[in-house]
Amino acid sequence: MFLTRSKLKINFILLYLLLIFLNSIPFKHLFAEDIYIGVASNFLTPMKALKENFENINDGQIFISSGSSGSLYSQIINGAPLDIFLSADQNQPKKLEKTAKAIKGTRFTYATGKLVVYSTKKFLFGQSFPQFLTSNKINYIGIGNPEYVPYGRAAIEVLKSLKVIKEISPKLVLGKSVNQVFLMSFFGNLDLGFVSKADFLSNNEKGKIWEIPQNLYSPIKQDAILLKNGEKKNNAILFLKFLSSVRTKEDLKRFGYVFD
């Protein structure tokens, strides 16, 4: 069936407009590749800064899904379409590495976190750690649920090292993530919380923190791993290289992370 002259003219105009539109887009943007990253809650604010830096020099967008390391692990096992997993520990990525959900040989430590005690209660500001932990004035002490929150497990280590775990157990409030513990402390719902130093440095530094000696808990090494969904995504591989770069490590030091 032959097209009429008017239909040919319309088709030509539409094709011409399409070519103009495509010509207005830089060639590389036509093939921009988005990636999806599961991020432990303690690393959310630094990750937002890294996302901006990465997107400024690469095409495509980064979409972030945040939560506790344990909950993100469960989501990945159950088919969540993530390309990269940034955990707050080494255990979850190691377990994933033994499954078909992750790419073996891609796991590495991207940062080591610092555990601190945090409070906005002024009556504590002149007190010393760890003496105030057993004070009668303190009723609520927050930690991340040690079942699936790495910073919560570190907090339990500290309390056991100090031999106060039995005494203060009735005062413990378990958060779903270390970030939730920080927020409950930030708004005064807790007398104090065991949180990531990054959360404090990322939130205007309201209140006060007490540094915890490193010999009281195991180093909180945070591992990244490439997931099966991201295996063939160039941007996923580029991001992991970006994450391990010297410049990124310098940026992360501002958030309280340390490096070997």
Feature annotation, model-predicted:
Residues G105:
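Active-site acidic carboxylates
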